[in-house]
């Protein structure tokens, strides 16, 4: 029975809710069925054993979560303020990520990786972001984007060449955005011209996260402009390749320890064996990877919101005004309760999207919902925390202002909040 249930869960198709116009709405309301469940799945789960709550973790997940929390508090927290001020990540922090196995979470153990689950990556990103969003981002890019792309689309030779290094020593970055190709990423102008057994890449990319520390760049370039966006191809480019230049890091509002740089390509010669997947399929890989990566950003923003909340509540339970603890004023209690409820909703959305991905089930809508809600909430809750703490919350002597600055990027990268709403609306339209 359990095996059959697993097969149904993994193979279930998205239920299209096309109700006949003659059907009375009171008999079968549209909301009666979850958009991510098929009828077979519903039957299988209704008669089977009770399903575990979303916040039930395996022993491995609990162990990873606990270890990362300890690492973040002991090896990241002491450097957070300095890294933010200097706009530079401490080498010891990056080395620690590799030593702890946090840069190759899903990479198979035969390549030197941890061999854990995608959900484990989500837990790691969340725990790191509670302490520092920049460190969480480095881990997020490596695990939810680069490692997964090479694992899914790479040849055995590419996996053997890059995955061991990505798991143990080499940070990475993905190059998609350009000056005129942000949300409209398929409008990219970077080109890749075939010359014998090589491709020559020319162009420039903008807003490239982790560019300053990356030893490997996954680059999207158009190999056939006559085919439009279907000419976009994905290349694996080593950081020391001649003609690849990383520019000066941007002076950003938040996530300052994470380098965000322009990257230019001047006659960069890449062997055709470094094409990831198939020529002209880069746009598919980009869409698929970003859909998955959005769950990572949701986890990051969830961590930012939770970290700020965890710091603020003890403060307002101690500080007194008018002879009472600030926390004891009903007006503030209502605000705290509202934020705590929204925080729990963001966590459930994020965990659900991650579990759906692991089960091989449709999760595009759920990933966008998680990213949208967690990102918007992070901005709101960090703003509220500053207000709750009063004047000290507005100073750099306390970390809540940094959480506030770090939160803003969540509504921008890997698809703005408006792009997420577009995606969610398209999915809803397809369901009815």
From Swiss-Prot:
Active site, UniProt feature: 414 (proton acceptor)
Pathway named in the protein's UniProt entry: Lipid metabolism; mitochondrial fatty acid beta-oxidation; Amino-acid degradation; L-isoleucine degradation
One Pfam family cited in the UniProt record for this chain: Acyl-CoA_dh_N
Modified residues (Phosphoserine): 183
Residues carrying N6-succinyllysine: 70, 284
Top-level taxon: Eukaryota
Reaction equations catalysed: 2-methylbutanoyl-CoA + oxidized [electron-transfer flavoprotein] + H(+) = (2E)-2-methylbut-2-enoyl-CoA + reduced [electron-transfer flavoprotein]; (2S)-2-methylbutanoyl-CoA + oxidized [electron-transfer flavoprotein] + H(+) = (2E)-2-methylbut-2-enoyl-CoA + reduced [electron-transfer flavoprotein]; (2R)-2-methylbutanoyl-CoA + oxidized [electron-transfer flavoprotein] + H(+) = ethylacryloyl-CoA + reduced [electron-transfer flavoprotein]; butanoyl-CoA + oxidized [electron-transfer flavoprotein] + H(+) = (2E)-butenoyl-CoA + reduced [electron-transfer flavoprotein]
EC number per UniProt: 1.3.8.5
Annotated residues for binding of substrate: 183, 229, 283, 291-294
Cofactor section: FAD
Positions with a binding annotation for FAD: 174-183, 207-209, 319, 330, 387-391, 416-418
Primary localisation category: mitochondrion
Transit peptide boundaries: 1-33
Keyword match DNA-binding: no
GO BP term, pick one: isoleucine catabolic process
Keyword tags: Acetylation, FAD, Fatty acid metabolism, Flavoprotein, Lipid metabolism, Mitochondrion, Oxidoreductase, Phosphoprotein, Transit peptide
Entry-linked InterPro entries: Acyl-CoA_DH_CS, Acyl-CoA_Oxase/DH_mid-dom, Acyl-CoA_Oxase/DH_mid-dom_sf, AcylCo_DH-like_C, AcylCo_DH/oxidase_C, AcylCoA_DH/ox_N, AcylCoA_DH/ox_N_sf, AcylCoA_DH/oxidase_NM_dom_sf
Residues that bear N6-acetyllysine: 70, 284, 426
GO cellular component: mitochondrial matrix; mitochondrion
Compartment annotation: Mitochondrion matrix
Gene Ontology MF: a single term: short-chain 2-methyl fatty acyl-CoA dehydrogenase activity
Role summary: Among the different mitochondrial acyl-CoA dehydrogenases, acts specifically on short and branched chain acyl-CoA derivatives such as (S)-2-methylbutyryl-CoA as well as short straight chain acyl-CoAs such as butyryl-CoA. Plays an important role in the metabolism of L-isoleucine by catalyzing the dehydrogenation of 2-methylbutyryl-CoA, one of the steps of the L-isoleucine catabolic pathway.
Binding partners and assembly: Homotetramer.
Family the entry assigns: Belongs to the acyl-CoA dehydrogenase family.
Name the record gives this protein: Short/branched chain specific acyl-CoA dehydrogenase, mitochondrial
Organism in which the protein naturally occurs: Bos taurus
